[in-house]
Amino acid sequence: MIILALNCGSSSVKYQLFDWERKEVVAKGMVERVIIGDSFIMHEVPGRETYRKEYECPDHQVAIDLIIRTVVDADHGVLKDINEISAVGHRVVHGGEMFTRSVLIDEKVLDAVKEVQHLAPLHNPPNIAGIEAAQAVLPHVPHVAIFDTAFHQTMPEHAYLYPLPYEWYEKYGVRRYGFHGTSHLYVSKRAAVLLGKTPSECNIITMHIGNGVSHCAIKGGVSVDTSMGLTPLEGAVMGTRCGDIDPAIPAFMMQKENLSAKEIDSILNKKSGVLGVTGRFTDRRDVIEHASNGDHRCKVALDIEAYRLKKYIGTYMAVLGRLDAVVFTAGVGEMGWPIREKTIEGLEGIGIKLDRERNKGAMTRKRESLITTDDSPIKVFVIPTDEELVFTEDVVAILNGTYTDHMNFDYSFARTDFVRK
């Protein structure tokens, strides 16, 4: 059984082909610069050189057509025929309150996703375009939606409601939803295995740190709070997003700079965060390098980011009452040891003892690592995320009729005998 996982962004389409019987990725890649011009595909097959091809993709339909042609290509593909694909799993960023689990996509589901796209105007439209494009190319196979927000639908009312007019929630759905759900799900279940416990026995703080950043407080295996809110703008400092700020700042700056609502929204989402402070970088590797060479703004950007990460650990520790582990994941979380060090140092008083050598050695996306001392009461792990594996397992379980929900389903990666490939 071959499962195709798709993640459609506004100008990119990521994909992965997973062979369920062999339990391994047989191909993965990305089409970049969709719509905006100079498009190209980067196609990776284990054991082969990466294949790159320039091909104009004015829309997601052409991009997905290109992906299908590439995976069945005689020279660069891994499939003999398109009919080898058994099902498609689609990442959908926002499912609103309606979707608490992954679901088979039918007309009713697609209409419901369209109804909540006003809650994620930057993300849901390309997700929808990807679903419709893939259905056109693969009309006879099941398509499954996996929602970023679903994992967080267990949050209690006092955690997801904002202290705003209640009518805004009733009329417009204004509340905290949270994102990166599949990533938080995966690494929290892996952390439970590393702790030698079941997820229901664990209290864990997971920190997904990439260009986008989110934290999750997980109590007994379920999300009870998360840092992103109605949109992915709230929370920690991010690559280009501001995260938590005084809500009066946008109105203040709109008056000072004569900005429209659209312009201020763009600045907060695309020109703030690490980029805003440094003035030129979003890649933390560049920020770390220039900070070490004396660039004050880069140093301040790192200090701000680590300080905010540290604050969320303290906040969520108070929420959980008892903490077993903290997990770093995603690109920066997995590879950025200086940021991890800045975040964790000084937390000995609350039971977190960093092992600096272990932390520096945890610089790979292929290994799970403990970065605290053996006698640290609270453990800190670096766990490479695998959202596509969550997609795949949800799809297969839905096809087999064995899927329940993310809390109770028996994921392979939640077992002690799981081996990451």
UniProtKB/Swiss-Prot annotation:
InterPro entries in the cross-refs: Ac/propionate_kinase, Aliphatic_acid_kin_short-chain, Aliphatic_acid_kinase_CS, ATPase_NBD
Self-association state and partner proteins as the record states: Homodimer.
Q: What function is annotated for this protein?
A: Catalyzes the formation of acetyl phosphate from acetate and ATP. Can also catalyze the reverse reaction.
Asked if the keyword Secreted belongs to this entry, the reply reads no
Residues annotated as binding ATP: 14, 208-212, 283-285
Q: Which CDD domains match?
A: ASKHA_NBD_AcK_PK
Database matches in SUPFAM superfamilies: Actin-like ATPase domain
Residues bound to substrate are: 91
The gene name on file is: ackA
Question: What is this protein's name?
Answer: Acetate kinase
Q: Which Pfam families match?
A: Acetate_kinase
Q: Which reaction does it catalyse?
A: acetate + ATP = acetyl phosphate + ADP
Record key words, sorted:
ATP-binding, Cytoplasm, Kinase, Magnesium, Metal-binding, Nucleotide-binding, Transferase
Gene3D superfamilies linked: 3.30.420.40
Cofactor(s) the protein needs: Mg(2+); Mn(2+)
The record's disulfide annotation reads none
A GO cellular component annotation here is: cytoplasm
Binding sites annotated in the UniProt record for Mg(2+): 7, 387
